[in-house]
């Protein structure tokens, strides 16, 4: 398969600096890597943080962001096995890990101290050709709609892992805070597919209609409710058994520790810059609640999340725009005006 020497990409030289849509060299895969012709790439809040540089983890510079890339393998490093040119593959957040530490050996590769992160420490999917470690690259079944599967590679895997972390049983209530966004809209669907009752929390009537169309049983509009905590408790007859916090609101996270049911689990996913969680110790002990962080999933979680999608149980509410329009997508993201997930067509 013919591979060009240059490609279109969006790159920045400094954190918060100009996002340049321009020609850059096509990378050459290392011995353990795939070269993937990225057809589509989802846009995640993490990409916005990587550009701004407002997380306590330094990015490489200059940097090509993006970590939800779906495409076709066009070249293989000499040590790669189990892949062939023409396979569908995904660039996900975890680009590679050491595979030798205690975390990698126990299936917690995302927690590896030497983890290489797409669109953060490794040039990501906001380019037409990207490299990915052959062990960690996502396997996508042939014939899959690449535009629609792209958000599954991070957003889908992330919320699916969070729901597993909540350790709920079928028929129990789960509250999803930030339910209409890119992560939340997928969390609602995965929760429904896993047999849970879904209470969605977000702001605006249009968002209520949207999340109910995805499977939410109840919607709480935080812009209209005077007491969100009591409203959630009332709607779920005592509070949800689990909460998935994909919201980037520190206040919403705090409220979740108040309305979660006794013996319930609060799972933290969204990463508001500089945020802290605060809850009365007395209440946490008496209610015996658990507060858990949930990062991205491992290879098994990825395969399972993709399987839900390929079986038609998850629909990605996406809007496709050109790669060159990434700065406008970031602006909408900062203004909180995004329903579902924006996906970039890397050929535009």
Curated annotation (Swiss-Prot):
GO terms for molecular function: alcohol dehydrogenase (NAD+) activity; zinc ion binding. Keywords: Cytoplasm, Metal-binding, NAD, Oxidoreductase, Zinc. SUPFAM superfamilies: GroES-like (SSF50129), NAD(P)-binding Rossmann-fold domains (SSF51735). Binds 2 Zn(2+) ions per subunit. Zn(2+) 1 binds at residues 44, 67, 154. Homotetramer. Zn(2+) 2 binds at residues 98, 101, 104, 112. It is found in: Cytoplasm. Its cofactor is Zn(2+). SMART domains: PKS_ER. The keyword Transmembrane does not apply. This is Alcohol dehydrogenase 2. It comes from Candida albicans (strain SC5314 / ATCC MYA-2876) (Yeast). It catalyses: a primary alcohol + NAD(+) = an aldehyde + NADH + H(+); a secondary alcohol + NAD(+) = a ketone + NADH + H(+). Its EC number is 1.1.1.1. The keyword 4Fe-4S does not apply. Belongs to the zinc-containing alcohol dehydrogenase family.
């Amino acid at each position: 398969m013919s591979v060009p020497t240059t490609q279109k990409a969006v790159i920045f030289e400094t954190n918060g600096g100009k996002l340049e849509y321009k020609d850059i060299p096509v990378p050459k895969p290392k011995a353990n890597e795939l070269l993937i012709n990225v057809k589509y790439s989802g846009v995640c809040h993490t990409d916005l943080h990587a550009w701004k540089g407002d997380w306590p983890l330094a990015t490489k510079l200059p940097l090509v962001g993006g970590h939800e890339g779906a495409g076709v393998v066009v070249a293989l490093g000499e040590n790669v096995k189990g892949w062939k040119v023409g396979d569908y593959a995904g660039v996900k957040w975890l680009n590679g890990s050491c595979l030798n530490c205690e975390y990698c050996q126990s299936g917690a590769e995302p927690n590896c101290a030497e983890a290489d992160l797409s669109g953060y420490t490794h040039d990501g999917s906001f380019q037409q050709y990207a490299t990915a470690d052959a062990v960690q690259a996502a396997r996508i079944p042939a014939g899959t709609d690449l535009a629609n599967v792209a958000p599954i590679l991070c957003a889908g895997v992330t919320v699916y892992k969070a729901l597993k972390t909540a350790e709920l049983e079928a028929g129990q209530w789960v509250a999803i805070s930030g339910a209409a966004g890119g992560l939340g809209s997928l969390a609602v669907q995965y929760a429904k597919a896993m047999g849970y009752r879904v209470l969605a929390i977000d702001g605006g009537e249009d968002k209520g209609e949207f999340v109910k169309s995805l499977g939410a049983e109840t919607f709480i509009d935080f812009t209209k409710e005077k007491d969100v905590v009591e409203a959630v408790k009332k709607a779920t007859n005592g509070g949800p058994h689990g909460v998935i916090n994909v919201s980037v609101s520190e206040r919403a996270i705090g409220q979740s520790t108040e309305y979660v049911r006794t013996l319930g689990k609060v799972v933290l996913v969204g990463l508001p810059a500089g945020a802290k969680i605060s809850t009365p110790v007395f209440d946490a002990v008496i209610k015996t609640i658990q507060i858990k962080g949930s990062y991205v999933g491992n290879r098994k979680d990825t395969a399972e999340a993709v399987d839900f999608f390929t079986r038609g149980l998850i629909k990605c509410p996406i809007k496709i725009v050109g790669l060159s329009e990434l700065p406008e997508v970031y602006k909408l993201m900062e203004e909180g005006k995004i329903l579902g997930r924006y996906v970039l067509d890397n050929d535009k």
